[in-house]
Amino acid sequence: MDIQTILEKTLPGLGYELVDFELTAQGTLRVFIDKEGGITVEDCATVSNHLSRVFMVEDIDYKNLEISSPGLDRPLKKAADFVRFAGQNAKIKTRLPIDGQKNFIGKIEGCENDTVTISFDGKTVQIGLDNIDKARLRPEFKF
């Protein structure tokens, strides 16, 4: 099995969502997890211990394993992410331009039929999930 398949099969059974992962050229495997209510250090330790054993059995080659929360500016990858974070601000970069524009910053209105709706400057734009190159939450800090 490949790393993504292992993570997608293992993490939900432990009560966590796979947000993203990366394997660096230096061999560091970074796994970003989330769950309702957020991630604690204990969660990271639990997942690290479990995945270390699974990767040993599956003979996955890596040097270091890092488990982390996705952070306040977490990536948005699936339709469920856009539904969950509706009402919050996001930055979306598209693969193909929409009305001559590829970068959008605005409020997520929702996601239906694999189409994300985002509003900004009094306009509303619909973006197909297949046209999204990168999307991240843009947290607001009020002082």
Swiss-Prot record:
CDD domains, per the entry: YlxS_C
Family per record: Belongs to the RimP family.
Pfam families (UniProt xref): DUF150_C (PF17384), RimP_N (PF02576)
InterPro entries with a match to the protein in the record: Ribosome_maturation_RimP (IPR003728), RimP_C (IPR028998), RimP_C_sf (IPR036847), RimP_N (IPR028989), RimP_N_sf (IPR035956)
Function per UniProt: Required for maturation of 30S ribosomal subunits.
UniProt keyword terms in alphabetical order: Cytoplasm, Ribosome biogenesis
Record-linked SUPFAM superfamilies: YhbC-like, C-terminal domain, YhbC-like, N-terminal domain
Main localization (coarse): cytoplasm
GO cellular component, one term: cytosol
Name of the coding gene: rimP
Subcellular location: Cytoplasm
GO BP term (any one): ribosomal small subunit assembly
Name the record gives this protein: Ribosome maturation factor RimP
